[in-house]
């Protein structure tokens, strides 16, 4: 097969691993910067061009689209989809997952347990917002934040009001969540491929922090997950329409709670911790689904 990887930086670990895994299985691979793609949208002959040339047909496209380029990155991916390429995560699913409010609404509608969450845009009644999620301590987030950026733990009501007021000055959308103290600064990252959790790690925050993101200095170890955690991770990914997802779960006293679903999970931390060839599993999924029948169904 001919496979395109959409990424701004082909030297990143995840891109290199996906390229290696695909080539090892005999596929042709090209890494394309989605921001350098430009499109001819034409009912007679739509096409995608890249750095002065018209791109050929790709059997499959692997999107590694960062949150900062979601709009144009998913637009480029849609063009590949319209031309019959199989997407490992559809553009609509990526857009859905990147909208934190929309994704939480969909997960809640499906009965998936979440931390108690409130969301507002520059709330005038800060005290009621805090009360709505059960009071302090609580976590205040910028809706547009990633990798632990724009996330603050407010341990008292006064601190929570100060943080919310500060975020209000940014004219930003604010997400307020209950703080799960019993998780002790740890979460479980489940890597879902299709209908299976192929690997799971526990991520714990460094001393003095509560954010478990590996980019923020968190420490990872192999996790043994329960059947319920496995089922919740798979259901969360499927609810958002994702074939590949990183599902972050908090272990609360009342049971596992889904904190976030990542549409473009990094592979480095989880592969190096578990030793699982996740990139290979992703390529195998493509091999099973990027079939001639798929291209005919789409119209490619």
UniProtKB/Swiss-Prot annotation:
UniProt-annotated binding residues for Mg(2+) 1: 248, 260
Residues bound to Mn(2+) 2: 260, 262
Any one cellular-component term (Gene Ontology): cytoplasm
The protein's Enzyme Commission number: 6.3.2.-
MF (Gene Ontology): ATP binding; metal ion binding; ribosomal S6-glutamic acid ligase activity
Annotated keywords: ATP-binding, Ligase, Magnesium, Manganese, Metal-binding, Nucleotide-binding, Protein biosynthesis
Residue positions binding ATP: 141, 178-179, 187, 211-213
GO BP of this protein: protein modification process; SOS response; translation
Residues involved in Mn(2+) 1 binding: 248, 260
Cofactor(s) this protein cannot do without: Mg(2+); Mn(2+)
Domain named ATP-grasp: residues: 104-287
Cofactor: binding comment: Binds 2 magnesium or manganese ions per subunit.
Ligand binding (Mg(2+) 2): 260, 262
The keyword Cell membrane appears for this protein: no
Statement: the UniProt record of this protein carries the keyword Ligase: yes
Superkingdom of this protein's organism: Bacteria
HAMAP family documented for this protein: RimK
PANTHER family noted in UniProt: RIBOSOMAL PROTEIN BS6--L-GLUTAMATE LIGASE (PTHR21621:SF7), RIBOSOMAL PROTEIN S6 MODIFICATION PROTEIN (PTHR21621)
Role of this protein: An L-glutamate ligase that catalyzes the ATP-dependent post-translational addition of glutamate residues to the C-terminus of ribosomal protein bS6 (RpsF). Is also able to catalyze the synthesis of poly-alpha-glutamate in vitro, via ATP hydrolysis from unprotected glutamate as substrate. The number of glutamate residues added to either RpsF or to poly-alpha-glutamate changes with pH.
Protein name, UniProt field: Ribosomal protein bS6--L-glutamate ligase
Originating species: Salmonella schwarzengrund (strain CVM19633)
């Amino acid at each position: 097969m001919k496979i395109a990887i959409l990424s701004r930086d082909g030297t990143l670990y995840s891109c290199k691993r996906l390229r290696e895994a695909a080539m090892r299985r005999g596929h042709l691979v090209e890494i394309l910067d989605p921001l350098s793609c430009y499109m001819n949208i034409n009912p007679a002959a739509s096409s995608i061009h890249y750095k002065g040339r018209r791109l050929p047909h790709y059997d499959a496209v692997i999107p590694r689209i960062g949150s900062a380029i979601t709009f144009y990155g998913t637009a480029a991916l849609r063009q590949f989809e319209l031309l019959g390429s199989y997407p490992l995560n559809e553009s609509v699913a990526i857009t859905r997952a990147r909208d934190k409010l929309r994704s939480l609404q969909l997960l809640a509608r499906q009965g998936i347990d979440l931390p108690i969450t409130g969301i507002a845009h520059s709330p005038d009644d800060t005290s009621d917002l805090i009360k709505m999620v059960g009071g302090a301590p609580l976590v205040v987030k910028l809706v547009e934040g990633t990798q632990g950026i724009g996330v603050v733990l407010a341990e008292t009501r006064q601190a929570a009001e100060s943080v919310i007021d500060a975020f209000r000055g940014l004219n930003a959308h604010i997400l307020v969540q209950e703080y799960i103290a019993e998780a002790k600064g740890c979460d479980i990252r489940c890597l879902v491929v299709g209908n299976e959790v192929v690997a799971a790690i526990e991520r714990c925050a460094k001393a003095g922090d509560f954010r478990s993101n590996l980019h923020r200095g968190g420490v990872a170890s192999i996790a043994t997950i329960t059947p319920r955690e496995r089922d919740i991770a798979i259901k969360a990914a499927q609810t958002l329409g994702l074939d590949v997802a990183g599902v972050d779960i908090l272990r609360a006293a009342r049971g596992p709670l889904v904190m976030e679903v990542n549409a473009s999970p990094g592979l480095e931390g989880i592969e190096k911790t578990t030793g699982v060839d996740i990139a290979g599993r992703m390529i195998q999924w493509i091999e099973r689904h990027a079939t001639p029948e798929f291209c005919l169904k789409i119209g490619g």
